[in-house]
Curated annotation (Swiss-Prot):
Residue span, NACHT domain: 211-528
GO MF term set: ATP binding; cysteine-type endopeptidase activator activity; protein-macromolecule adaptor activity
Tissues in which the protein is found: Detected only in peripheral blood leukocytes, predominantly in eosinophils and granulocytes, and at lower levels in monocytes.
Entry protein name: NACHT, LRR and PYD domains-containing protein 12
InterPro entries linked: DAPIN (IPR004020), DEATH-like_dom_sf (IPR011029), Leu-rich_rpt (IPR001611), LRR_dom_sf (IPR032675), NACHT-assoc (IPR029495), NACHT_NTPase (IPR007111), NLRP_HD2 (IPR041267), NLRP_innate_immun_reg (IPR050637)
Family: Belongs to the NLRP family.
Organism of provenance: Homo sapiens (Human)
Amino acid sequence: MLRTAGRDGLCRLSTYLEELEAVELKKFKLYLGTATELGEGKIPWGSMEKAGPLEMAQLLITHFGPEEAWRLALSTFERINRKDLWERGQREDLVRDTPPGGPSSLGNQSTCLLEVSLVTPRKDPQETYRDYVRRKFRLMEDRNARLGECVNLSHRYTRLLLVKEHSNPMQVQQQLLDTGRGHARTVGHQASPIKIETLFEPDEERPEPPRTVVMQGAAGIGKSMLAHKVMLDWADGKLFQGRFDYLFYINCREMNQSATECSMQDLIFSCWPEPSAPLQELIRVPERLLFIIDGFDELKPSFHDPQGPWCLCWEEKRPTELLLNSLIRKKLLPELSLLITTRPTALEKLHRLLEHPRHVEILGFSEAERKEYFYKYFHNAEQAGQVFNYVRDNEPLFTMCFVPLVCWVVCTCLQQQLEGGGLLRQTSRTTTAVYMLYLLSLMQPKPGAPRLQPPPNQRGLCSLAADGLWNQKILFEEQDLRKHGLDGEDVSAFLNMNIFQKDINCERYYSFIHLSFQEFFAAMYYILDEGEGGAGPDQDVTRLLTEYAFSERSFLALTSRFLFGLLNEETRSHLEKSLCWKVSPHIKMDLLQWIQSKAQSDGSTLQQGSLEFFSCLYEIQEEEFIQQALSHFQVIVVSNIASKMEHMVSSFCLKRCRSAQVLHLYGATYSADGEDRARCSAGAHTLLVQLPERTVLLDAYSEHLAAALCTNPNLIELSLYRNALGSRGVKLLCQGLRHPNCKLQNLRLKRCRISSSACEDLSAALIANKNLTRMDLSGNGVGFPGMMLLCEGLRHPQCRLQMIQLRKCQLESGACQEMASVLGTNPHLVELDLTGNALEDLGLRLLCQGLRHPVCRLRTLWLKICRLTAAACDELASTLSVNQSLRELDLSLNELGDLGVLLLCEGLRHPTCKLQTLRLGICRLGSAACEGLSVVLQANHNLRELDLSFNDLGDWGLWLLAEGLQHPACRLQKLWLDSCGLTAKACENLYFTLGINQTLTDLYLTNNALGDTGVRLLCKRLSHPGCKLRVLWLFGMDLNKMTHSRLAALRVTKPYLDIGC
């Protein structure tokens, strides 16, 4: 009897200790040691330190006996703040005090079963259910777990990054996993973090608690594990206490297979641990129920459009499609709450069923959580640190570990390498290499076996994967397996090796453990020898590529990347030697020929799908192949580069580009600047972290670009728009610019996070590189210190720069003195753009000193938005009378006013003024300014273009201007009068002007109230053979059908005439 009591106590105590997390178990041991340090039965710390739950229970009972061990454990549970275990233990003690005569017919059955039998009749139904949920969700099996192996969910689970989701459905990518792209949004600016604990709490947007929460996330991002953790934490009393009395978990994949009708009662019974559930208690307060519907995207199409009446009460039996729809649509018990998980591909279908749900997106692991995951996966802290540091230093691997599933794959692969005694190698740097390493690790030989053990009929597996991919099918029935030569024995082998998963509760249906693995095997199907792929689709790789067309939205995107990666020589060797698969020898040549034909059809320009194309080339990791593939393109434009990984992929490929003449790399970081609108990526399936603006790119990125400058003698233009190079990146890039082989002529570094200190390296590059003639540094924090450094290079006799753009570079008046000295010493500089800098009148006065210098050869000067006033125009006027080289001057968006323009006209009228283009848009001009400009048009024979847009000139101003336009000496060819307050009366003057002026060819009148009368008058003049006008823009006017007909007729009689309306 004593032995029975001991077994009983050991069973009960070890069960309770098993529920403690690792930290809690350590605290339990410390508190226990404190409580017993004065007693004779004290347990030595050396015995407790490494003891697990079972060993700890044995130590307690050995030293104190069953009763005292149980008492000590309960008091310690209370001290470590696990009151749920203390309260449950107290209740069990009450039941155990049942008087003699209780059930004794169990005989020699397990005392643990006797305990349950004794407790059940008097146990609270909610506690019974909580116990069941704990048992069901406490343990989880890894995908490669052997029989009986499991992991405590609480010990492995790592908190996921959740944000409130407000993105448009068009921004959601249709594919389920694409490790080559990250989440294309700036998390800190476009989404609000949220915790699981507050999912059903009100916030500023909704004062009432939401009844439905949708958690979306790409495949492998951790939706199901999170749903399981919610169930477990509720059962443990850590979550939603006081909010929900019961949580029920519904697996949509299992619901797919239900062929019989069922009711809500039946659904509850299927979740309940006992034959009957307390339905009346549940119905009584439905608002305290939460149903977790896991995997909405996996439901069959019939679930989205069910036929028949809704299920409106608990007892009604309906097909599972109708039952689940009634539950989701809140036709059945609208008071209850729902937590629905889904992939982005099903969001639109789900939206149609719900009313005002809260949307939450699972973004995966942050950097800190990735580290935490590694330390939880590897129990050895030293080993965990070694692996994490390796992965952190390996950019592609570390980026992919943002996705929990991929994080697990990487950990599994690297653990296999460590256990094999090998060093951590660089073979895991691509997506394909990671998946191949995972596959090989699953096929490691058993002890004593001579070689890897591949699955039987592996080619049939690849054929099944490809067939499912083309038909967009992820669940397979028995007949699908038979079609590809796979029988039950094959499936059993795949399950054992964790390549092919058989659903525990859906035995008739099978699936790959993850869509990405199906795509991996589908790619292998295409590299097998012809006829070796089973009953799958056509193995013509060109059909695959044509359908894919390097589109990130294509359902073939990841498969195509895997295809390139599998053709890597080392990977191919693994396939042939380790798995005995024969790879088709002509696939590489087929790929190169297809790329060549695509280049020819696109005019040797790579733009559409360029980033996806680079991702494919990155996977193959073969220098010669990449060089051949890129040799057919002369112009390469890569847009929307949103992550460090994408920058790395791009620079990796461009380093191996030997033929391109023009390279443009556009980053995708959001900007509030209207001029630089964000080019945001539309995909939500993407799974990499977008680069924050405050972060600079890795050195390797700039090193690769510098290498491209050294090795590609054809490269003459490089544009790096919104690439966060930073000072270190610029230094590395300039090493390439200074290389003798560099022939670059045009360098654009607009908004590349360049500080003033980096200008020293740029200055040295200007001196060393005599080919460089154009440079754009706009949108960088150059400032006065940077300008000083930059001008040292610009003043050097060897500098050959002809154009420099310094828009919005935080320059002030002091910078103009430096630039003036450049204008006085550098005869090569002909274009200068200082737009968007607060130069003010003082700065312009200093700049004019350089403009008046005899050495100055400047032809084009942009001074838009420079805080200039009328006072600056006097200085400009005197400069225009002296400078013989200036041809274009832009003063738009400065408050010059009529007085300023009248002063400017004095210089414009001077006989030596050679200005041809003058822009005065949005300069607060009125009709008075037109009088002075009219005189200029008569006196200045060089002026060809005049922009007066967005000034309140009015009809009187145009009348004054027309006097100059009608003068025989006027040579103006283009005139902008957009939004100048003109009416139909102005058209009378224009009518006569166009009849006289023989040089004006372009007239822009957008957003003026000319009306039908005014426009028809213009049409009358335009129809005259003597009218020389070729461009007339009339956008923004409300014209009737008759006027539009007149314009259409005019287009017919004068097809060369560009009429915009």
